[in-house]
Amino acid sequence: MPPEPRFVPRFAAEPPQEPLPYGRWADTLRAELLAAVLALGDDVGEPGDVVWFPDRTWAGRTYVPGTARTDRGLELFGCVSYEVAGEPGAFAATVDVTEEVAEAHPEWRIDLCDEVVGAWRGELGKVAQMTLVWGVPLVEGAAVATAELARLVVDQCTVMENRFTLLAPDDYRGDTLDVRVWDERGHELAVESLYEED
């Protein structure tokens, strides 16, 4: 095999190891996420139920993303992470809020959220942003989601209950991530960039 023309981390994160959170575990994660919501102030409103996404593990931490609507029509999005050695511990949570929701954007094919969780140092001092990306396909029949950097697949995730989570290098050497969803036969159904087009 010839050398790789693009030297970037591929499939760096473990695939999902657990079912989507439920019961007491979901309650624990919700408490951590809502504690982070307090820092956003009262203007966001009262959060509703949290929709959890598949877990991904990288660099010794497991990340579980989630979203929740508030009674003011905003969407909270963030993730809870924890150390993976033994029982979950050293919890941390990040959360943000947006007015941009899928119902207001019929042109969207995939509803995406993202959070930078680390960095990967490449050649010649270039740095990739290791980015957690979670989303909901807005097209029927999605079975697998992939993350691509300059048309190179760098991560993939089986769609679980119409949700997926990716963890991949982004913003590296001028290239940014595209997310694609595919049906069970490998036909592309939709593609979205993490960045708004000008």
Predicted regions and their residues:
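Long, contiguous interaction/targeting segments characteristic
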Residues: 1-113
